[in-house]
């Protein structure tokens, strides 16, 4: 059985594909998740994260932009952007502890990003105000 960390990793891949112009990726999401052996509750979790992130993408991007110090949003690496979007969605819209979300995002950035990605992702997500919760 897949873990939530593996589900998040798959969601980052889906968000990356979406960002690269594959806006129809949702049609294939279940098949892709099953290929990665993400099923049942973890699959539901992954789809909720993906769908929620896409549904709130404009708001999420604006929130990220507020916390970029001396960075332009368009200069963020594609994988880092996907990780930040997922992390921001979870911090703002889920009941999961911020520290868990940030830790998961940092671990994802170690896998998908460059040497500077973990520190960058940590800094941006840590700057999000904890009172940002939205319904």
UniProtKB/Swiss-Prot annotation:
Q: Does the keyword RNA-binding apply?
A: yes
Gene Ontology MF term list: RNA binding
Establish whether keyword RNA-binding is in the entry: yes
Pfam families with a match to the protein in the record: NusB (PF01029)
* Gene Ontology process terms (BP): DNA-templated transcription termination; transcription antitermination
Assigned keywords, A-Z = RNA-binding, Transcription, Transcription antitermination, Transcription regulation
Could you tell me which InterPro entries the record lists for this protein?
Answer: NusB-like_sf (IPR035926), NusB_fam (IPR011605), NusB_RsmB_TIM44 (IPR006027)
GO annotations of cellular component type: cytosol
* Protein family per UniProt: Belongs to the NusB family.
Q: What does this protein do?
A: Involved in transcription antitermination. Required for transcription of ribosomal RNA (rRNA) genes. Binds specifically to the boxA antiterminator sequence of the ribosomal RNA (rrn) operons.
NCBIfam families according to UniProt = nusB
Name recorded for this polypeptide: Transcription antitermination protein NusB
Which organism does this sequence originate in?
Wolinella succinogenes (strain ATCC 29543 / DSM 1740 / CCUG 13145 / JCM 31913 / LMG 7466 / NCTC 11488 / FDC 602W) (Vibrio succinogenes)
Q: What is the lineage of its organism?
A: Bacteria, Pseudomonadati, Campylobacterota, Epsilonproteobacteria, Campylobacterales
Q: Which gene encodes it?
A: nusB
């Amino acid at each position: 059985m897949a873990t939530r960390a593996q589900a998040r990793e798959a969601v980052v891949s889906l968000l990356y594909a979406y960002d690269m112009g594959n806006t129809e990726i949702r049609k294939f999401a279940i098949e892709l998740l099953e290929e990665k052996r993400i099923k049942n509750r973890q699959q539901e979790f992954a789809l909720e994260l993906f769908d929620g992130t896409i549904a709130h993408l404009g708001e999420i991007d604006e929130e990220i932009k507020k916390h970029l110090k001396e960075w332009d949003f368009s200069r963020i690496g594609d994988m880092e952007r996907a990780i930040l979007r997922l992390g921001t969605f979870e911090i703002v819209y889920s009941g999961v502890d911020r520290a868990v979300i940030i830790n998961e995002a940092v671990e994802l950035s170690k896998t998908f990003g460059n040497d500077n990605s973990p520190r960058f992702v940590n800094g941006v997500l840590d700057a999000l105000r904890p009172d940002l919760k939205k319904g």
